[in-house]
Amino acid sequence: MNTQVLPVNEESIALAAKLLQQGELVALPTETVYGIAADARNGEAVKKIFEAKGRPQDNPLIVHICGMEMLHGIVSEVPERAKKLAAAFWPGPLTMVMPRGPEVSEVTCAGLDTVGVRMPSHPVVQAVIKASGVAFAAPSANLSGKPSPTNAQDTFVDMDGRLPLILDGGESAVGVESTVVAVTGEHPMILRPGYVTKEQMEAVLGEEVLVNHAILEKLKDGEVARSPVMKYKHYAPKADVTILKGSFDAYRDYIAAHAGDGVWALCFDGEEAQLPVPAISYGKEGDGISEAHNLFTVLRELDRKGAKTVYARCPLSDGVSMAVYNRLIRAAAFRVVEV
């Protein structure tokens, strides 16, 4: 298959809409990361996403819409909490898990009776949804397990020959996938952290928002994944990543004792020159927004530089930094060392 990479204009948006209507795949930019879109109602089209990514089909996908009216048929009920959160954060990087409606393919939801829905703010996604009339399922546009792409070039590296079209809309602003929150049950619960934080949602809802244990630790054997990325290793570069938890001095000393061929440091701004091995920063210490924006791009850069072993500085685990820690701990296959 020949994969075209086209700049965003009326013609390329019309082509993307036509392909989606025909049951084909399109990769396109969102404000979070680049995604692979297919008609969420068309099970055969959605299966192509799993094939293109090499992704297990028990990993649910998120449905993307461009207006509240599109929820009809996608969900069977819009809880009051969802209406409040939508008013505050849609369009934007928030996915809400609600009872599944009759129009969504079972393949999209991995057989669950719930579905995650998001209204993205990126103008390209909105334009394609409007032009096609299709609510689409769209995970990140990477091969399964690799870091999510935040630009068209990295998307092409993974998806060349796997789908017909990539729309080049420049760099994604946020850099990590959306927050996923389940809005049914006694309390809302974060299933995947992102740019919209626990604290922000609590301020809107006036109630506690719980955090699922699988955000910062592995799922237990036999436990069902309720959200994307809960079950499998994700976001990983080719190198073995280990997170080092402790002071900068302890981090530097640990790396000095483990230096060798192919060893790299993944650190914070301003620390690179103080380390005994090649180093690359993923943002300002304590600044979850900058860390989130840079993380996946930097993990892919480590691949390009031939890193074999990466020792990463540990981010915080609250606010937007919770999303960074969640991605990094999975890239490290939960290898964390106290130093």
At which residue positions do the language-model features occur?
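Active-site-adjacent structural elements in enzyme catalytic cores
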Residues: 1-339
